[in-house]
Regions:
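N-terminal targeting signals for export/organelle localization
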Residues: 1-43, 153
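Non-catalytic, surface beta->alpha helical segment in thiol-disulfide oxidoreductase systems
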Residues: 117, 122-153
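C-type cytochrome heme c attachment motif
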Residues: 73-80, 120
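Structural signal for short hydrophobic segments within the conserved structured cores
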Residues: 38, 97-99, 130-133
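A short beta-strand-turn-helix
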Residues: 40-64
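Extracytoplasmic/secreted proteins, especially bacterial periplasmic and envelope-associated proteins
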Residues: 40, 44, 66-69, 80, ...
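Short pre-active-site segment immediately N-terminal to redox-active cysteine/selenocysteine motifs
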Residues: 63-66, 70-74, 117
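Thiol-based oxidoreductase modules, predominantly thioredoxin-like and allied folds used
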Residues: 70, 81-89, 93-108, 115
Length: 153
């Protein structure tokens, strides 16, 4: 019985590692090309967007415009906005990168960016200052911000 359990454990570990090998970790580049919404942590934010610990004034670290969706799983308007954000990530794949931040899991990041209401979308152009949108807004309004703030057609 012990040999059987040990053999099954080894087989399970090998199977799990093999499954993982077939799914490469999403990076900023394949997020942009695949059109998926990526989860953003505080550490990744400091690396890819803005290191607020090193810089006092805004200095964007990316090379494509970014939308960051600050949300919470318990927030009704956040759940309404989520499919729209997913759709826009697909529509503008390769032109913008879309991230999401669960403010319950990343409270330091939310505080550091001054997020006080949910949902909050942060539109970050390659050059210039970020702009925010608070609340569940229509898709047309978000597309207008993509065109006017992020300068993406």
């Amino acid at each position: 019985m012990k040999k059987f359990l040990f053999s099954m454990s080894v087989a399970l570990v090998l199977l799990m590692s093999n499954c993982h090998a077939g799914n490469p970790a999403k990076t900023k580049d394949n997020a942009a090309t695949s059109g998926s919404v990526m989860v953003l942590t505080n550490d990744l934010f400091k690396q890819k967007i803005f290191n607020y610990e090193l810089n006092k004034s805004w200095k964007f670290e990316g090379n494509l415009p970014v939308i960051i969706d600050f949300y919470a799983t318990w927030c009704g308007p956040c759940r309404m906005l989520s499919p729209i954000v997913e759709e826009l990530a697909g529509k503008y794949a390769g032109k913008i990168i879309v991230y999401k931040v669960d403010t319950d899991k990343e409270p330091l990041l939310a505080r550091s960016m001054g997020i006080q209401s949910l949902p909050t979308l942060l539109f970050i152009p390659v050059k210039g200052q970020p702009h925010s949108s608070i609340g569940a807004v229509p898709k047309e309004t978000l597309e207008k911000a993509i065109h006017e703030v992020l300068l993406v057609k």
